[in-house]
Swiss-Prot record:
Keywords: Ribonucleoprotein, Ribosomal protein, RNA-binding, rRNA-binding
Family: Belongs to the universal ribosomal protein uL4 family.
Record protein name field: Large ribosomal subunit protein uL4
Record-linked HAMAP family: Ribosomal_uL4_B
Source organism (scientific name): Rickettsia peacockii (strain Rustic)
SUPFAM superfamilies registered for this protein in UniProt: Ribosomal protein L4 (SSF52166)
Length: 207
């Protein structure tokens, strides 16, 4: 499958052949894409929510009042879950929300996400993702030429430092090396910009 190579000025400068098994899958599996996104989001959760149990709450262990003769329900501790200021029963604990997902499924998810963007015409190949200076205003003017609301930029094995610094202060613009390419960011952003180097490395990686 052939597609245009664009410059950062959004002008056609050549043509590139994309591997159809990676960028033009015939049937897009939305279920696989969702599965990978759910796996990513669960893995990203910190899981540091926690409440104190009866044994962890600070306070006295003294019996609040005698067992019989007061007319009240019997109580053994002021730290019990039914008492104000007591512990919490079955509350959230510190844990990992991460689940397991086979590498083959994760790889398939990336392939189908790239194919979906390509089918929508929102995957663009750029000849070079390099800037002379780390100027945000320069990069904003460049991205405005593509008329998109959000951009996920994937470079080769290394990201240009000037491009990376310029993109830091731009809302909904993320730049990563090819190893950082992921399903969630591909789907979340309107446009995916790939450098020529990123295309060749991704094709080798996902083959």
């Amino acid at each position: 499958m052939k597609t245009k190579i664009l410059s950062l000025a959004n002008e056609e400068v050549g043509e590139i052949s994309l591997n159809e098994d990676i960028f033009a899958v015939e049937f897009i599996r939305d279920d696989i894409i969702k599965q990978v996104i759910d796996w990513q989001r669960a893995k990203a959760m910190s899981g540091n929510h926690k409440t104190k149990t009866v044994s962890e709450v600070l306070g006295t262990t003294k019996k609040p009042f005698k067992q019989k003769g007061t007319g009240n329900a019997r109580q053994g501790s002021l730290r019990s879950v039914q008492m104000r200021g007591g512990g919490v029963a079955h509350g959230p604990r510190v844990r990992s929300h991460a689940t397991k997902l086979p590498k083959k499924v994760r790889k398939l998810g990336l392939i189908h996400a790239l194919s979906e963007k390509c089918a929508e015409g929102k995957l663009l190949v750029i000849d070079s993702l390099k800037l002379d200076k780390p100027k945000t205003s320069v990069l904003v003017n460049i991205l405005n030429k593509f008329q998109g609301k959000s951009f996920f930029v994937i470079d080769g094995n290394e990201v240009d430092i000037n491009f990376s610094l310029a993109a830091k202060n731009i809302y909904n613009t993320v730049i990563v090396p090819q190893i950082g390419a992921n399903v969630y960011d591909i789907i979340r952003h309107e446009y995916v910009l790939l450098s020529q180097e990123a295309v060749s490395v991704l094709e080798e990686r996902l083959r």
